[in-house]
Amino acid sequence: MARFAVLQLLLPLAAGLTGASFPAQIPTILEEPDTPHYAVHHTVVSASSLSESLKFYVDGLGLDIIRNYNFQGDLTTLFGTNTSVLPGYFLGDTTSVYNGTDGVIYLVEFPDAKKIPTDESDPPNTGLFLTSFWMGDKLNATLDRLDRLGMGGKPHIATFSFGSEPLATYATVRDPDGARVLLVSRPYINSIGKQRP
């Protein structure tokens, strides 16, 4: 069975709904990776301001801009929005083993998106709860960088253990639109103890 990202399947559909031509060459970020694996390809973050969110995710968290990509087609049918062009950026780690083809954030700005008010004391909402990033030994440096940028809010930090061994330190911060972001301090061990590639 082919391992296509959901967006790869949606692009031709969106183009077909409007009769628009589909690009002859799909950008690298949308191509199926050579290495067979199953993973979340990308998460879409709807930003009220692309520039502020780029500052948070790129300057603050240290993600790379993989490419600028404007999603075009019948977005009214697909997403219920009142536009046919969705400006955005694919963000991720261009040095990863999958060369930026998984674990990617697609940062977009809908012209008619509704801002959902959030408060630090609010309990979690249903639906997408947070986006998590492996930080390795860069957790403190990342939190310092966010503080210098005046972004992220007050971090909530906790260390968890597995028996007597520390497992990882976690910090939650907020992106410019209030979405929860979890920063994890140990990138080489996942929550069930398997080595990452």
UniProtKB/Swiss-Prot annotation:
One of the record's GO molecular function terms: metal ion binding
Phenotypic consequence of gene deletion: Reduces, but does not abolish, the production of terrein.
Name recorded for this polypeptide: Lactoylglutathione lyase-like protein terB
Organism ancestry: Eukaryota, Fungi, Dikarya, Ascomycota, Pezizomycotina
Induction (free text): Expression is under the control of the terrein cluster-specific transcription factor terR.
InterPro entries: Glyas_Bleomycin-R_OHBP_Dase, Glyas_Fos-R_dOase_dom, VOC
Record family assignment: Belongs to the glyoxalase I family.
Taxonomic source organism: Aspergillus terreus (strain NIH 2624 / FGSC A1156)
UniProt enzyme class: lyase
Signal peptide positions on this chain: 1-19
Domain of life, per lineage: Eukaryota
Keywords (A to Z) from UniProt: Glycoprotein, Lyase, Metal-binding, Signal
UniProt-listed Enzyme Commission number(s): 4.4.-.-
Residue positions with a glycan: 82, 99, 140
Function (record text): Lactoylglutathione lyase-like protein; part of the gene cluster that mediates the biosynthesis of terrein, a fungal metabolite with ecological, antimicrobial, antiproliferative, and antioxidative activities. The first step in the pathway is performed by the polyketide synthase terA that produces 4-hydroxy-6-methylpyranon (4-HMP), orsellinic acid (OA), and 2,3-dehydro-6-hydroxymellein (2,3-dehydro-6-HM) by condensing acetyl-CoA with two, three, or four malonyl-CoA units, respectively. 4-HMP and OA are not pathway intermediates, but are rather shunt or side products.
